[in-house]
Amino acid sequence: IIKQGEEVERMHTPLAYLRAKIRSADEDGAVSVRQLEDTDAIVIHDKKERIVTYIYEYEGKLRELYASEEVKPMLSAGTSLFTVYDFEAQENGGLLQVSIHDEQGKASRMMMELKSE
């Protein structure tokens, strides 16, 4: 039971973090998904500060990178947040879908409606 609880928490925590991060930044046009070096990335624009936050998977870790709008992001430069496998993000018609997998291939997913579009 403890092991099962740890597995659920390990998969829930990254998705809860993403949900909170996106909700706190979601305003018209601020959140999108794009490819960085063939990797899905959630992109959050802070238009006032002209800062972009990228959230993506690199080398088995969910990472976060803050950069100026003018700087080309490098995946290796992000701060490691959580161990995840096979991170996928899609945005379609104002609906953000994210899935992550654990080391056994079990998927956890979330969907959020975005204010942006």
State the predicted function of each range.
Residues 37-95:
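Type IV pilin-like appendage domain
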Residues 1-6, 97, 101:
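N-terminal non-globular leader segments, chiefly Sec-dependent signal peptides
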Residues 15, 72, 79, 113-115:
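General N-terminal targeting signals
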Residues 84, 90-117:
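Low-complexity, S/T/G/P-rich flexible repeat/linker segments used as non-globular hinges
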Residues 11, 74, 110-112:
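Detector for methionine-enriched segments
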Residues 2-32:
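Membrane-proximal N-terminal amphipathic helix
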